[in-house]
Amino acid sequence: MSGGKGKAGSSEKASTSRSAKAGLTFPVGRVHRLLRKGNYAQRIGSGAPVYLTSVLEYLAAEILELAGNAARDNKKSRIIPRHLQLAIRNDEELNKLLGDVTIAQGGVLPNIHQSLLPAKKAKAGAASQEL
């Protein structure tokens, strides 16, 4: 009888996750489950969660890279919401994508309107041209 787990049926190999097959870190299975539970469509194709997961992973990596650069510029080793805000608002495409998103504790971009800045003094070489 070969009903139990014996050495005779050990030709089975360990299962490989869809995330590993696609070379992703984010969970494809979880995204697939959330797509099914979310009632976005009656049927979900097998490639849709892989594609969506890869897009989400790319966006997360892009934002985290820019936020890490902002943290390093501020001589910090930990990313805080302010760094996320600076990273997103200084990048044209991410700002367009996340323009209506409010980041808690993010603050605002430093910006002083030109009319509020002190007037520049005239150069000495351009003396008065009075007659």
Curated annotation (Swiss-Prot):
A Gene Ontology molecular function term of the record: protein heterodimerization activity
Location(s), subcellular: Nucleus; Chromosome
Protein's UniProt keywords contain Nucleus: yes
Region annotation (Disordered) ranges: 1-22
PTM sites of type N-acetylserine: S2
Modified-residue entries (N5-methylglutamine), positions: Q105
Gene3D superfamilies: Histone, subunit A
Residue numbers of N6-acetyllysine PTMs: K5, K7
Major localization class: nucleus
Record note on modification: Phosphorylated to form H2AS128ph (gamma-H2A) in response to DNA double-strand breaks (DSBs) generated by exogenous genotoxic agents and by stalled replication forks. Phosphorylation is dependent on the DNA damage checkpoint kinases MEC1/ATR and TEL1/ATM, spreads on either side of a detected DSB site and may mark the surrounding chromatin for recruitment of proteins required for DNA damage signaling and repair. Gamma-H2A is removed from the DNA prior to the strand invasion-primer extension step of the repair process and subsequently dephosphorylated. Acetylated by ESA1 to form H2AK4ac and H2AK7ac.
Motif ([ST]-Q motif): 128-129
GO cellular component labels: nucleosome; nucleus
Keyword annotations: Acetylation, Chromosome, DNA damage, DNA repair, DNA-binding, Methylation, Nucleosome core, Nucleus, Phosphoprotein
PROSITE patterns xrefs: HISTONE_H2A
Modified residues (Phosphoserine): S128
CDD domains according to UniProt: HFD_H2A
A Gene Ontology biological process term: heterochromatin formation
Reported function: Core component of nucleosome which plays a central role in DNA double strand break (DSB) repair. Nucleosomes wrap and compact DNA into chromatin, limiting DNA accessibility to the cellular machineries which require DNA as a template. Histones thereby play a central role in transcription regulation, DNA repair, DNA replication and chromosomal stability. DNA accessibility is regulated via a complex set of post-translational modifications of histones, also called histone code, and nucleosome remodeling.
Quaternary structure and partners: The nucleosome is a histone octamer containing two molecules each of H2A, H2B, H3 and H4 assembled in one H3-H4 heterotetramer and two H2A-H2B heterodimers. The octamer wraps approximately 147 bp of DNA.
Family to which this protein belongs: Belongs to the histone H2A family.
Domain description: The [ST]-Q motif constitutes a recognition sequence for kinases from the PI3/PI4-kinase family.
Further facts: In contrast to vertebrates and insects, its C-terminus is not monoubiquitinated.
Name this polypeptide is given: Histone H2A.2
Record organism: Candida albicans (strain SC5314 / ATCC MYA-2876) (Yeast)
Gene name linked to the record: HTA2
